[in-house]
Every structure is written in C-alpha cells, then in structure tokens.
Amino acid sequence: MEFENKEVVNRPLVSVIIPIYNVGTTIYRMIECLEQQTFQMFELILVNDGSTDESEEICKTIIRNHQNYYLYSKENQGAFSARNLGIEKANGAYLTFLDADDKIDSNYLEILFHNCMGTDIAVCDVAVYKEDTEISRFTGGNQKITQTQALNKLLVRKEINSGPCGKMFSQKIIEEVRFPFLRVYEDILFVLECFCKVREITVTDKTTYYYMQEDTGTMGRMAKSPSVDIIAATEKIMDFIADRRDLSEECTYITISHLYQYALPVAIQNNYRGCEFILKTQILYRKYMEQILKCKAMPWKEKVIFYLYAHGYVYTNKFIKKIQR
C-alpha cells in the first residue's frame, strides 16, 4: 500500500530512505534533524515494515506537512526488505540511509552530497552513543582512499562502520545493488558490494551520524534466539577475502573473531549442548580452518580456541567444555 503526498515533478538531488518498524517514540527526533538540514533538496522515503504500534499513523501525519516526504507500507520482512523498496522508489541522483532512532548533524546531507559528487560514495564519522555518552567513534579524517583501503577499513571495523548509515551513494552505483535477504549482517554485505563498484571513496569528518545504541544487549538477545543468517554472511565474507589478494590478513582475523563473539554466548546459553547455530558454526570453522591457521594477524592462542571449537570444544574461563550432541 502506498501513501504519497504529491507526484514527483522535479527530480530531487538526494533520496533519504528510512525503514520504519515500531519507532513511534523516536521517529520525530529524526524528522526534526531532517527539518534542520542546511541542504533541503531531498526527498524522504519512509517505508513502514509492518509496524504494530502507532508508527504508520505518525508517518501519515508527518508526510501531510511536507511536500517532499513519502510513505510506503508493506508486510513485515525486515530492514533489508524495507530498504530495498526504498531504493526502488527513490528518485534522487544520490541515496542515503538513516535509522529512525538515530540522529544526524544539521550539515549531514550537505557535507555528504558535496563529497559524494567526486567519487560516487562518501563516508562520514559515526559516533556510537549509549544514553548520553559517546562510547566509540568510526572516523577516517578527510581524504580520498582507494577501493582496497576502503574494503580493509570496512572489514576490520576500523574508521568505517559496517552499516549503510553514515554514507551516501550515487544512484548509478546503487542501481543494481540490493540488500541480501538476511535478517542480520545484510548491511555489511550491501556496503561491500557498493565499495567494489568504485575506484575511490571520499571520507570526511566534517559531519557525524549518531548511532543510538539500545540498552538491551545484542549479544544477549542473539544468545537466546541465534540467527543462522550470521553464518551465511560470514561465509560470503570469507570467500570474498580469499578471492582478494590485496586485502589485509586482519580481515580474516576480525571476521572469524566476530562470529565467535556470537557463538560463545550461544554455547553458554544452551549449556554447551549442540543446536543448529552451534553445529553450523562448527562446520564453517572447519571449512576455513586452513585460512585461520595461516592467518598471520591472528594470535596462536585464538587459533587454538577456534580449532577446538571446530571440533566440538569450547574454551571459556580457562576451562575446556565439550559440546554435547
């Protein structure tokens, strides 16, 4: 179902895409950020992904007051599906993605737009906040970097965050790229594919995207209901790294370590009994064991931990636990 407040007469320079799912308490904050932008030649595409709260009604109210705001509603499938619909509906020469519960600087669109014009992709600082405190920041200064440099920074989770937010893409780059059908980890695969379509990327610290971290821990939620989508995504990333001889070995180390950060809590939550997530993770570690053992960036202690896990044992608190079938 579509709710539009006017026909598109003139093509906007930028399309801003926001997936909407039960964000009735935070959406106005992001709308206020957009209203305060120094750059106003944009359209806003809100995609309601089957919200069960008042989000859709709030969005209908919002678009009535803005001629360049549009709302599309669909059944719940996940952020990947909502963003893909947003891409299909976008009319801008450039696209950027926001999340409804985050914040941006008032010069966010202006800075990214001007930096994106020369290289087709622009990346800005991303500050991670918990409540009112900044707990980390991705920052790469002001520079143009090569595709290889950008991929390395993305995959080692340094300077460039893994998600689509904090970035702007030209429409010609994103035209044939879509978010994969995964509930989690779909964002880094999307960004990875976009980065592979350009020779250079512009990085700027002149504006900031503020990621507002939830109070509830992602790892805790993941341990209770693990998603095998993480395993599928990790496999794609590992294959990508193996095919690219120009990438740092740290990319392998970080990718494998990041998966283990999910696998260990799942094993503990299940009292060291095997479940689908654990068994499939073990298969992945065995599949890439040669890459793991040859990785010069990975400490030997962690290689041993991953080897043990691949063969049914978990190392935790100086004890080795056998995973029960």
Tell where the protein language model's regions lie, with residue ranges.
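Membrane-interface aromatic/basic loop that binds lipid-linked glycans or pyrophosphate carriers
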Residues: E2, N271-R325
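Short, well-formed alpha-helical segments that are part of the catalytic scaffolds
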Residues: N22-Q36
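A conserved acidic beta->alpha catalytic loop
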Residues: C33, N48-I58
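Short beta-strand/loop segment that forms part of the nucleotide-sugar
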Residues: F42-G50, Y70-E75, A100
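Glycine-rich, basic loop-to-helix element that forms the pyrophosphate-binding segment
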Residues: K74-A90
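Donor-binding/catalytic cores of nucleotide-activated saccharide
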Residues: A79-F80, A100-T202, Y211-P226, P299
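Short aromatic/hydrophobic "clamp" motif used to bind/position activated sugar donors
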Residues: L95
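Catalytic core of nucleotide-sugar-dependent glycosyltransferases
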Residues: T208-E214, G220-L247, Q261-M289
